[in-house]
């Protein structure tokens, strides 16, 4: 039995679309409808374009106004209890990542710890992206996570908290 519950977003599609990037001649454009297609950076966004190219990507797809970072994720972990506090989530993600990397001998190392993952994450400019399902977290380049605006997992947890405490 799967102990993880992948929850539908509590936020509305409209709320999520409001948090996605707008078409902007200095930033990027949508390939189709905002929040329901790919957001592509303009040519002058050379740093983001270079990062995307390392993953063979031209932009980031949004599914129902949720950024889909799976194609630029170095690792994916699943939290039993996502928090509204990012540092709590990141600490647990680092621990789970260490467990996984030890099993696959990532970078020829089988002595990963939460602390080592945290140091690696910081030295390689990586962040955990909390998905809207309030369970899944992807390890992605921080600049990609920041550039492709979105309403993410912590916001969903805050929506859930408000809903429960009504």
In which residue ranges do the predicted regions lie?
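Nuclease and nuclease-like effector domains acting on nucleic acids or nucleotide cofactors
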Residues: 1-127, 131-166
